[in-house]
Amino acid sequence: MSGRRKGCSAATASSSSSSPPSRLPPLPGHARRPRRKRCLVPEVFCTRDLADLCVRRDYEGLRRYLRRFEGSCVSLGWPSQCIYVVGGEHSPHSLTEIDLEHCQNDFFGEFRALHLIGTVSHATCRYQVFVDAYGAVFAYDAQEDCLYELASDLAGFFAKGMIRCDPVHESICARLQPNVPLVHPDHRAELCRRSRASARGRYLRSLLAFRELLACEDTAARCAYVEAHREAQLTLIWPEKHSLVLRTARDLGLSASMLRRFQRSLYTREPVMPLGEIEGAEDKTFFHRVRILCGDTGTVYAALVGQDKLVRLARDLRGFVRVGLALLIDDFRYESIGPVDRSSLYEANPELRLPFKKRR
């Protein structure tokens, strides 16, 4: 019996291996489709892929992606005939290492990592374009040595284009009104030099006023500092002769329901605490009585008079010290204020070098 079973199984195996697999005939009225050869989809530059690499902070992948599609062009939302050219650190229009370190160290009051993603060409001008660790897009104007924050992310950059860049507006106005005399280059260079020196001095004075509040690490510490230093005036970098007067919610007349209303107006719905309100040298200033609030994440907001929605001013308190209220008038220009360290505060207040008892 066992031998017979083995023979049957062997015969079955041999017959199954020798005979080809049977295929069902096609159904009547249905013809077989010929098999198509697989082909690779041609790779093209995609703005979504670039934005995804920046959001994930995959800078090694970003470097490879920029090198692969170097030279690709994308039309921006504004102005017309304004083109973004893909390129990284190996592109022919790339910055030198010295210029890149200058952009990272001398504009924000602290080091900020910037990654070159290409250039923008408009008329005869070229602007290098960077992204930072948070996805914000910046353009560098080498002629006036300043940075412009073009958008908070790459999607906004491709939609808005260079609408926040002042030299682009000036070049368009010069083309539309050719009879208007232009500023002499030497005079313009002197104005830029004075603007940089003024911005550095105002930033150091504001940083000196905010240094204790900047040392607070969380919301509880900031609340305690505001409560302990009520009516203290902290100088702003802009507008000039304006300061933030530290006041609590009770001093400002903000109820819990009003704070919740402010919170609901935010995309993140984070709790907010008041820092104070703005006071200027004159009561008729536009920024008088503007309330400043800070979220749990450190984001700084402004509450305009008579409005229930908050306006985002800066990503953190140190960023607010750097820009002040400039974003309320759509001023996104960063002057080169140079490197800032502990010894730089002596420029704003030379008496810090003296012993405590001899300071006035």
From Swiss-Prot:
Q: Where is this region: Disordered?
A: 1-33
A Pfam family that the UniProt record links to this protein? US22
InterPro entries per the UniProt record, alphabetical: US22-like
Family assignment from sequence similarity: Belongs to the herpesviridae US22 family.
Protein name according to UniProt:
Uncharacterized protein UL29
Task: Supply the source organism for this entry.
Answer: Human cytomegalovirus (strain AD169) (HHV-5)
Q: Which gene encodes it?
A: UL29
